[in-house]
Amino acid sequence: MSEDEEKVKLRRLEPAIQKFTKIVIPTDLERLKKHQINIEKYQRCRIWDKLHEEHINAGRTVQQLRSNIREMEKLCLKVHKDDLILLKRMIDPMKEAAAAATAEFLQLHLESVEELKKQVKNEEALLQPSLTRSTTIDGVHTGEAEAASQSLTQIYALPEIPRDQNAAESWETLEADLIELSHLVTDMSLLVNSQQEKIDSIADHVNSAAVNVEEGTKNLQKAAKYKLAALPVAGAVIGGVVGGPIGLLAGFKVAGIAAALGGGVLGFTGGKLIQRRKQKMMEKLTSSCPDLPSQSDKKCS
């Protein structure tokens, strides 16, 4: 059984796929968002034990989300190639929501790390004598603007998790799960796109092959007509030169068949008979083969 024969129409799998895209996965994403809010709250308040528990619970949700996406991916792989565009439209909103939720979750820790780097850099700068002063550009003190921006960042950035806390280790595990989830969502999108590109490539090759076959068929038909037209003339010329029964034999020899009539006229007649016989054979052969659709017919359809 070929791969295409194992595929099914989207309408047969649509209810199961929509159950994932509209119910199961959105529910997981909503649960993940609640974990994110709790994690931000516990980390900001420095409640490390609660933060550790929330990291573990969030990790379970991420694993469940990954499992559900894989199950949906199995269904997507069964969809017939003709329905891949509709399938892509169906799963794209879910894919974008999952990618955005994962990126937003990872951004929590990223902002904390960036803020920590800024704090270390500022502390190093304070240890050195100040060599520059704030300058004024268009009436705005750049030093004051940078200080205001830094204080605003400190308000929203989360405090660093102490390395001696279990929450630090549980976050690393959760972060790895989130990154794997992000890769899974990306791979699923690439899988559907690659299937469509593969189909488009096959279609292009089929169209090119059809053009080549069509042109080759025309050339063969022309060559066959030229060959058939030459048979009576060649038979007449050779039959006229040789004459008699041998001339007739020579006339048939040109056509590829021997018979016994006689003379130059009979040589022409022998070639003519073979021409008709070969013409009938060619018509019978071409009529038994299916017509190749031309490129103009495809465009019109």
Swiss-Prot record:
Keywords, ordered alphabetically: Acetylation, Autophagy, Coiled coil, Cytoplasm, Cytoplasmic vesicle, Endoplasmic reticulum, ER-Golgi transport, Lysosome, Membrane, Mitochondrion, Phosphoprotein, Transmembrane, Transmembrane helix, Transport
A single GO molecular function term of this UniProt record: SNARE binding
One BP annotation, GO: autophagosome maturation
Region listing for Required for interaction with COPB1, TMED9 and TMED10, in residue ranges: 273-301
List of residues that carry Phosphoserine: 288
Keyword tRNA processing on entry: no
SMART domains noted in UniProt: t_SNARE (SM00397)
Cited PANTHER family: SYNTAXIN, SYNTAXIN-17
Quaternary structure, from the entry: Forms a SNARE complex composed of VAMP8, SNAP29 and STX17 involved in fusion of autophagosome with lysosome. May interact with VAMP7. May interact with VTI1B. Probably interacts with BET1, SCFD1 and SEC22B. Interacts with PTPN2 and ABL1; involved in STX17 phosphorylation. Interacts with COPB1. Interacts with TMED9 and TMED10; the interaction is direct. Interacts with RUBCNL/PACER; promoting targeting of RUBCNL/PACER to autophagosome. Interacts with VAMP8, SNAP29, VPS39 and VPS41; these interactions are increased in the absence of TMEM39A.
This protein's name: Syntaxin-17
Lineage: Eukaryota, Metazoa, Chordata, Craniata, Vertebrata
